[in-house]
């Protein structure tokens, strides 16, 4: 099912980078950015995590970002632990929630992204986010979902390319209203 404004998502239960089991229902009462990323070694995904981490304090204390990668936990630890992120990073090894919420894969859009987002790709690699292994679907297009304190979807963005996300400015506006 595709996520729409006004929806309430079912509970998502996945292993977290910190070793615990995360449940989406634990975020009720906070504003939330839920993002479905590609595989753990994705340079653009890791650059986005880095950007969110740098801006995290400006989102306010009643905000949480939840990052879901199509990866097994060991691979996720290998590529994302260095972030020391102040938010949960989850492993959906079996692509279960990606399928449930109609997260798309597209080879043409993947290839197009390699052209139009080459600057982000190179920046990610320069920062050390080098995709040595491809464990997970490389053609997955990200999805960002902003959810209010009551668990209701307010904004949803199904990406048109690998670097297409809700802007940091929009997240700040959402979290500070």
Give a label for each model feature.
Residues 48-100:
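Structural microenvironment flanking redox-active thiols in thiol-disulfide oxidoreductases
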Residues 9, 21, 28-30, 62, ...:
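A structure-centric signal for secondary-structure junctions around beta-strands
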Residues 1, 24-26, 57, 135-137:
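Short secondary-structure boundary/capping segments
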Residues 37, 69, 148:
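Short beta-strand/turn micro-motifs composed of small residues
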Residues 92-163:
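Thiol/selenol-based redox catalytic cores and closely related redox-interacting motifs
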Residues 162-177:
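A short, polar/charged loop-to-alpha-helix boundary motif
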Residues 1-25:
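N-terminal "domain-start" segment that seeds a small globular fold
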Residues 24-52:
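Short active-site neighborhood of thiol/selenol oxidoreductases, capturing the structured segment around
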């Amino acid at each position: 099912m595709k996520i729409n404004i006004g929806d309430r998502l079912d509970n998502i239960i996945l292993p977290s980078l910190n070793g615990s089991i995360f449940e989406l229902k634990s975020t009720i009462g906070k504003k939330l950015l839920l993002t479905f990323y590609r595989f753990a070694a994705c340079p653009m995904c890791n650059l986005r995590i880095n950007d969110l981490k740098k801006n995290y304090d400006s989102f306010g204390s009643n905000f949480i970002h939840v990052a879901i990668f199509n990866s097994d936990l060991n691979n996720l630890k290998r590529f994302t632990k260095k972030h020391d992120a102040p938010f949960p990073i989850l492993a959906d090894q079996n692509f279960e929630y990606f399928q449930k919420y109609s997260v798309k894969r597209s080879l043409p859009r993947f290839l197009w992204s390699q052209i139009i987002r080459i600057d982000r790709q190179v920046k990610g690699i320069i920062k050390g986010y080098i995709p040595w292994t491809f464990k997970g679907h490389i053609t997955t297009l990200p999805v960002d979902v902003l959810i209010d304190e009551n668990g209701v979807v307010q904004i949803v963005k199904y990406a048109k390319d690998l670097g297409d996300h809700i802007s940091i400015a929009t997240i700040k506006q959402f979290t500070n209203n």
